């Protein structure tokens, strides 16, 4: 008797070499008995956000991130006032990616239509865009006209290497190429630039020039250095949507090397983003880069003491990653003011919180679609663990993809998805409309191609050895901090009095997080995972030449074809190279819909 074996596999990459570098999520609320680490006020102080992706309404299933945008605005306003009273300067910065990842931004068209208005109620001093502001023409138009050219931010929005295309085809700078200003208290003369990484998937209303090309080939940069000589500038701020640590492209380091040619002795402070991690890099004795996480989990704080009487030639940098919760905000405000009863809310903050809540209800984001009986993790559980989200998808979700009516039922199939289509952990509790936007916001179309089993069985391995498959999902883990020699500088924390949370290692050591947490191990995420259905008791019993279906997301088509043709050639099979003409529409529900249907049973 021929039996159908549903054998759903995930790539085992990273199961052996787990690393406690960047844990993804906190699980429990921090104990009030756990002492937090203070922020240190300098001559110039920075508050930094990045990669918020629409998370303006707090993390409803995670108490460690229970502050909403109104709480954050109130915190910044009060903190700014307290620092200014100490005769020190404050600069508030955001480095882009404000949509794609939460219902508050994504349940409207275009994404960010309503959330941008709330986001912009923060009084940023400097801001720019990320790649998620450029995936569609509608998003680019909204960002350019609603934020970049708004009366509030027109003189504060900087984007040195992106151009916007007007309705008549005219190319104009997306924001200021650079700006100069003087800080109000310390009277520091500041030059600010901003760069987006070499992003090649912009829509037809925007053009991105690679940063190094922009610097070396455009006349504005040379004009800038000629009119802003080193002796006239006290501080350079380079903020943008590119990683602090990037062992492959090293764009930040290359930008720094070029700017250093013109400003060899000036303090240069960088602010990065894109790879969704907490990070701090020292570029030289007068330059560092801060990257402040993602998804309104982190408030980055940095101070520079530029007038140290002992050694004026060596500025003192101090960084802190603040957990995005109300208790942490209250702690830092009370310590700064030496007052445990310091107010932590403002009229403006309460208004913003109400707007966030009203928008959540208007978009029906709390609509319950099912129940999640346990928590599933993206990368802090091994891929073969029943607590891993990809394990759930490949074992419980993808097998429910119903083939079309004309599909041959005896045909074996391999269903592949790119891991970047999953954006976040799935937490125990109600499965709501918002949950869909948070975990798997994108719909997909299924395509398939017919190939011999011997080829299909090698596609997953081939893709997981190749470059990252482009998507709107989590950026490549290849940008995560590299630890040479295979050892960590920081200990793995396992304290029964602590909750799980971020335990960050950076160039300044192991104590940058304001809230001590237990570490979580981080497992590498492969490019793709697959569900394999082979119509034999054992796969090895199947005829390797038997034709099977490889099913995949439509945007993966070129990657699949490249893999299939390379495998065919490597095996020396007598087959013509396959093309898009050999791929067909498969049909069936999207993974997003399959996920919803699965949890609707609970």
UniProtKB/Swiss-Prot annotation:
Superkingdom, taxonomy of origin: Eukaryota
Subcellular location: Vacuole
UniProt xrefs under InterPro entries: 5'-Nucleotdase_C_sf (IPR036907), 5_nucleotidase/apyrase (IPR006179), Metallo-depent_PP-like (IPR029052), Nucleosidase_C (IPR053828), Pesterase_C1039 (IPR014485), YHR202W_N (IPR041823)
GO cellular component: cytosol; extracellular region; fungal-type vacuole
Post-translational modifications: N-glycosylated.
UniProt keywords, alphabetically: Glycoprotein, Vacuole
Sites where a glycan is attached: 305, 497, 577
One Pfam family in the UniProt entry: NadN_nucleosid_C
Single GO BP term: NAD catabolic process
Name the UniProt record assigns to this protein: Uncharacterized protein YHR202W
Organism: Saccharomyces cerevisiae (strain ATCC 204508 / S288c) (Baker's yeast)
């Amino acid at each position: 008797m021929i039996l159908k074996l549903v054998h759903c596999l995930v790539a085992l990459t990273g199961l052996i070499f787990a690393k406690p570098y960047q844990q993804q999520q906190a699980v429990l609320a921090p104990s009030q008995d756990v002492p937090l680490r203070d922020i240190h006020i300098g001559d110039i102080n920075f508050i930094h956000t990045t990669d918020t992706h629409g998370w303006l309404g707090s993390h409803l299933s995670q108490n460690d991130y229970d502050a909403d945008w109104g709480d954050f605005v109130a915190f910044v306003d009060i903190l700014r006032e307290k620092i200014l009273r100490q005769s020190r300067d404050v600069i508030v910065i955001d480095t882009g990616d404000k949509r794609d990842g939460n219902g508050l931004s994504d349940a409207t068209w275009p994404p960010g239509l309503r959330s941008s208005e709330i986001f912009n109620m923060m009084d940023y001093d400097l801001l720019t865009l990320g790649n998620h502001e450029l995936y569609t023409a509608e998003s680019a138009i909204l960002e350019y006209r609603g934020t970049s050219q708004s009366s509030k931010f027109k003189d504060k929005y900087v984007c040195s290497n992106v151009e916007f295309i007007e309705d008549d085809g005219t190319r104009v700078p997306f924001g200021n190429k650079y700006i100069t200003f003087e800080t109000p208290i310390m009277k520091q003369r500041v030059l600010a630039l901003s760069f987006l990484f070499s992003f090649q998937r912009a829509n037809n209303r925007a053009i991105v020039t690679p940063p190094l090309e922009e610097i070396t080939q455009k006349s504005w940069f040379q004009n800038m250095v000629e009119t802003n000589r080193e002796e006239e500038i006290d501080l350079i701020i380079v903020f943008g949507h590119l990683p602090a640590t990037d062992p492959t492209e090293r764009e930040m380091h290359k930008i720094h090397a070029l700017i250093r040619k013109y400003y060899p002795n000036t303090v240069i402070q960088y602010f990065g983003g894109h790879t969704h991690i907490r990070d701090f890099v020292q570029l030289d004795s007068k330059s560092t880069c801060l990257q402040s996480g993602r998804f309104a989990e982190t408030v980055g704080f940095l101070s520079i003491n530029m007038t140290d009487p002992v050694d004026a030639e060596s500025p003192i940098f101090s960084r802190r990653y603040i957990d995005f919760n109300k208790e942490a905000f209250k702690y830092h405000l009370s310590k700064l003011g030496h007052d445990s009863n310091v107010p932590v809310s403002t009229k403006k903050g309460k208004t913003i919180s109400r707007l966030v809540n009203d928008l959540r209800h208007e978009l029906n984001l709390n609509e319950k679609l099912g129940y999640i009986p346990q928590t599933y993790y993206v990368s802090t559980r091994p891929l073969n663990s029943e607590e891993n989200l990809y394990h759930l998808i490949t074992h419980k979700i993808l097998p429910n993809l119903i083939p079309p009516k004309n599909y041959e039922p005896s045909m074996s199939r391999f269903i592949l998805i790119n891991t970047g289509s999953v954006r976040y952990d799935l937490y125990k509790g109600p499965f709501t409309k918002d949950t869909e936007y948070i975990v798997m916001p994108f719909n997909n179309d299924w395509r398939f191609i017919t190939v011999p089993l011997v080829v299909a069985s090698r596609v997953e391995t081939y893709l997981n050895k190749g470059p990252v498959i482009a998507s709107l999902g989590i950026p490549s883990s290849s940008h995560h901090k590299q630890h040479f020699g295979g050892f960590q500088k920081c200990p793995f924390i396992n304290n029964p009095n602590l909750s799980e949370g971020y335990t960050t290692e950076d160039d300044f050591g192991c104590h940058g997080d304001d809230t001590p947490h237990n570490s979580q191990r981080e497992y590498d995420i492969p490019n793709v995972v697959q569900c394999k259905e082979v119509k034999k008791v054992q796969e090895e019993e199947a005829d390797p030449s038997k034709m099977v279906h490889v099913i995949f997301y439509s945007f993966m088509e070129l990657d699949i074809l490249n893999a299939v043709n390379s495998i065919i050639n490597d095996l020396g099979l007598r087959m013509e190279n396959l093309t898009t003409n050999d791929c067909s529409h498969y049909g069936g529900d999207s993974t997003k819909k399959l996920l919803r249907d699965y949890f609707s049973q609970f």
